[in-house]
Amino acid sequence: MAKLIRHNGAPAVEINGEIFPPMMATIRTNNRDSIIVDKEYYRELGKSGIRIFFLICDTIWLKPNAIELFEEEANALLEVVPDAYIIPRIGLHPTNEWIMENPGEVFKYNDGTSPEAYLFSESYETLLPGMYSLCSQKWREKAGTELLKTWNQIMKLPCAGRIAGCFLAAGGTSEWYYILPAVDEEKGLYGDFSESFKREFGKYLKSTYKTEENLKKQWKNNNVSFENPIIPGLDKHYYKHQVDIDAMMPRNMYANSDSPNPPNNGTNIGSFADFDKNVDVYDFWRAWHIGVADSVLYFADLMKKNYPDMLVGAFYGAYGCTDYFLNGTCGGTVKLLKSKSIDFLASPSVYENRLNGGYAGQRQPFDSFLINNKMYVVEDDTRTHMENDFYRDKYDVYDMTDTIERMKRDFGRDICINVQAWWFDQ
């Protein structure tokens, strides 16, 4: 039985009565359609004290040989670290055939297009015919059925006694974000006009306003309804990006020059939306994020109902990575923290300050996890001198000394701020 307990003031993993230290490992050897196993590497990780390993897995819906690939890797790990516990990191992506058969469940822009999207994850890479909606109820139901089919087969394997939890993965790089931006000013595009999101948006509005009279009053728009929620246009999103471009003066400014007028299109106050004029924008982004969180909850509820003794978690909550705001993966964090089906959420540390002298701060307000008796797990995907030239230069890491110092810093930070972590051999 795996569960979270309070230990020395913070959540800790307990499995069958044993408490585990705050470092785990995610091993990326399930490389697309093959396995690259380095048993000696596994052995050394085990010797260092790491006992909980996240292994990559997909559903048999997506990969008919998913169980065979997972079992091969699990057996290789347990051969050299026999007391290891495993949390499968299971991808819930639909097949391209399903996407083609369900156009209403695919992200759609205002011009009616649903562009192709390049999906890249640890074990699956493909050009999607369209970005599947991360709030699609049809996808939830189909992927949920396939999740249980796959999990039931995993639990029949000889290694089933070493399975301690389930890590739910979907969207770009398995991190529950839309690959396509909701708003693309350069191309004059905005969304999402898919049937799935409009249903989700309407559901959110009904839950928030109760009656359409209240909705129309708050939005100052008599044309809006729960059945037909209006997607805010580009002008409504001026505060997000275009205001910064317009603020860059195209002429020289001198000390005695007149102060320039702050850019304004009638919907913003500086780099903020004017809430009184943009309640619809606020509601749009809330629904955009809550819809993704509700999908995480759908699968988490499914797992806890069928396997209550398993830990359940997912990537979600990239507050400290503001580029991801458009992609729907942070605004529903509190809802997830309040759920009994969620044990932990994870995200990598911030990428922008990983250089020497940097801090690699967190994307999550992790003290909120302590308040809610949940665990925050930082993915220490620390780049090393073994990376390609681009990352060696980007993160200023050129030799073994740089690598060791960087890893010591990141691990020390985890200990000092009292968070769980996993090492990811990026």
Where are the language model's segments positioned?
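N-terminal carbohydrate-binding accessory modules
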Residues: 1-45
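The substrate-binding groove and active-site-proximal loops of carbohydrate-active enzymes
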Residues: 21-32, 53-67, 124-145, 204-205, ...
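Structural preference for beta-strand elements that scaffold enzyme active sites
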Residues: 22-24, 52, 83-87, 163-167, ...
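Aromatic-lined substrate-binding rim segments of carbohydrate-active enzymes
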Residues: 37-120, 141-144, 151-155, 298-306
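Acidic (Asp/Glu)-rich catalytic clusters
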Residues: 42-47, 73-83, 158, 334-340, ...
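Short catalytic/ligand-binding loop motif for oxyanion handling, primarily in non-cytosolic enzymes
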Residues: 62-63, 94-100, 172-178, 320-324, ...
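Polysaccharide-binding and catalytic clefts of secreted carbohydrate-active enzymes
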Residues: 102-336, 342, 359
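Hydrophobic targeting/anchoring helices
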Residues: 307, 313-426
